């Protein structure tokens, strides 16, 4: 008995009963085929029932979850209290989904294993050629009368084989040519040479397509603007709703619904309204009370950082006849607290010779004004008045004028001396001791400078004395 081929995608196979068999042989083949058909059908229906039961169990689980959620919703419908619902950001599903599997996965064909051998005792009938010819009249015989197979064989390798598992096995290596449809001789250097039917070689080659309208009519295509697909948050126009603060006895609305600031940051572009924390108030009552009690007890607490010593008072200026300095008052003696265990004579000597800041350290809050007051104020600073300084300058100028006019008493000499002094004052030069008794500037440059008229003098207090000299 010849072996029957089965399609590779099928899980089961059934043998066919061959014609022209002996009676006993035909009965055995029919019996074996029907038994195998019964086994295959039972296996198929059992797999279908198993898949139906699996889907039914899954549907029951989904219905159970649905009924539970529906019961929770029904319980929350009559409640008038605010309820927080936390939604998971991740979909409630397993990390790896279960792949679909066919119901015939793992099915095995047991026909080859269950094939039995039977011993036939009857003999074959002699061959009758006339009977064979008569059977050809009644049984259809497929005869290919067209020559399409020959033409297709010339174009390609023929029909596709059954053992092709991938596209790479179908196409030529590193190309897109299907050799079963069109045979191609590939040369990497010379290009692709195609072997075709000799009858088709006389046909005209395909013409190129017409050029587009943008080239033939010289039209320019409009450049399309690129669309922006980025997410741009926008609140838009928020409607203003005027409703009362509380709406009691409404169906499906909670009565104790309150909004607080701990809902988290808002979404863009709204600005996060974070309240500024209030700083604690600072009071100095406790500090002042503690400092007063410490002073009453005679104890001074040292400051945390050592304060820098105040600057020493400026040295007194030289005494003048106009403002004699007043004697400084004696420093106030502060009695030091007596120690319980006695004091060392070496320590007393060091304390007596040390400055006041070292003996009694300050609390680090001494200011410049306090140091000025301790120095004696205006009375001990030996300060001079501005008016007294002006009077002294005026007297010095008068003495210089008297010394300059001592050489001659005529009008021309006085005028010459005045002009020389005025030019020196404008130029900023101070006359030396020997120049005060001289006759005046000499030389060509000095004579030229004498011809230049002097600048008008500024309005000063000494101008009245000059006018008096002119009038005299």
UniProtKB/Swiss-Prot annotation:
Its main location: membrane. Residues 301-334 have a biased composition (Pro residues). It comes from the Eukaryota. The keyword Protein transport applies. One of its GO terms (biological process) is Arp2/3 complex-mediated actin nucleation. Residues 385-400 have a biased composition (Basic and acidic residues). One of its GO terms (cellular component) is recycling endosome. GO terms for molecular function: actin binding; alpha-tubulin binding; gamma-tubulin binding. Residues 1-51 are annotated as: Required for WASH complex assembly. Residues 352-472 are annotated as: VCA. It is found in: Early endosome membrane; Recycling endosome membrane. Keywords: Actin-binding, Endosome, Membrane, Protein transport, Transport. Residues 294-411, 429-472 are annotated as: Disordered. Residues 364-386 form the WH2 domain. PANTHER family: CXYORF1, WAS PROTEIN FAMILY HOMOLOG 2-RELATED. The VCA (verprolin, cofilin, acidic) domain promotes actin polymerization by the Arp2/3 complex in vitro. Acts as a nucleation-promoting factor at the surface of endosomes, where it recruits and activates the Arp2/3 complex to induce actin polymerization, playing a key role in the fission of tubules that serve as transport intermediates during endosome sorting. Belongs to the WASH1 family. Component of the WASH complex. This is WASH complex subunit 1. It comes from Xenopus laevis (African clawed frog).
């Amino acid at each position: 008995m010849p072996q029957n081929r089965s399609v590779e995608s099928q899980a089961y196979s059934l043998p066919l009963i061959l014609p022209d068999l002996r009676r006993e042989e035909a009965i055995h083949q029919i019996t074996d085929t029907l038994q195998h058909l019964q086994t295959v059908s039972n296996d198929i229906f059992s797999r279908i029932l198993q898949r139906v039961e699996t889907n039914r169990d899954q549907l029951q689980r989904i219905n159970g979850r649905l009924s539970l959620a529906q019961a929770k919703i029904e319980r929350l419908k009559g409640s008038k209290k605010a309820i927080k619902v936390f939604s998971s950001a991740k979909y409630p599903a397993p990390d790896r989904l279960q792949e679909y599997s066919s119901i015939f996965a793992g099915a095995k064909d047991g026909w080859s294993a269950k094939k039995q051998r039977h011993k036939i005792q009857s003999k074959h009938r002699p061959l009758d050629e006339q009977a064979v010819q008569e059977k050809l009249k009644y049984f259809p015989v497929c005869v290919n009368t067209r020559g399409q197979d020959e033409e297709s064989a010339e174009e390609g390798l023929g029909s596709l084989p059954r053992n092709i598992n991938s596209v790479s096995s179908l196409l030529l290596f590193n190309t897109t040519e299907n050799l079963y449809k069109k045979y191609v001789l590939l040369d990497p250097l010379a290009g692709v040479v195609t072997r075709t039917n000799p009858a088709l070689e006389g046909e005209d080659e395909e013409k190129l397509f017409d050029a587009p309208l943008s080239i033939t009519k010289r039209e320019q295509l409009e450049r399309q603007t690129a669309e922006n697909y980025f997410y741009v948050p926008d609140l838009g126009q928020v409607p203003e709703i005027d409703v009362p603060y509380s709406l009691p006895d409404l169906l499906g609305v909670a009565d104790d619904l309150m909004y607080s600031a701990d809902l988290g940051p808002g979404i863009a572009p709204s600005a996060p309204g974070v309240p500024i924390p209030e700083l604690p108030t600072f009071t100095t009552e406790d500090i002042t009370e503690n400092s007063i009690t410490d002073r009453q007890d005679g104890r001074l607490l040292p400051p945390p950082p050592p304060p820098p010593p105040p600057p020493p008072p400026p040295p007194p200026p030289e005494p003048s006849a106009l403002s004699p300095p007043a004697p400084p008052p004696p420093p106030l003696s502060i009695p030091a607290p007596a120690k319980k265990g006695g004091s060392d004579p070496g320590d007393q000597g060091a304390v007596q010779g040390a400055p006041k800041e070292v003996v009694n350290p300050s609390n680090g809050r001494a200011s410049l004004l306090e140091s000025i007051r301790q120095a004696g104020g205006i009375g001990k600073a030996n300060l001079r008045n501005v008016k007294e300084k002006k009077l002294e300058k005026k007297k010095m100028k008068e003495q210089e004028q008297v010394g300059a006019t001592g050489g001659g008493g005529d009008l021309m000499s006085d005028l010459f001396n005045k002009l020389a002094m005025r030019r020196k004052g404008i130029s900023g030069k101070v006359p030396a001791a020997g120049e005060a008794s001289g006759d005046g500037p000499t030389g060509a440059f000095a004579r030229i400078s004498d011809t230049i008229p002097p600048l008008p003098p500024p309005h000063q207090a000494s101008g009245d004395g000059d006018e008096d000299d002119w009038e005299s």
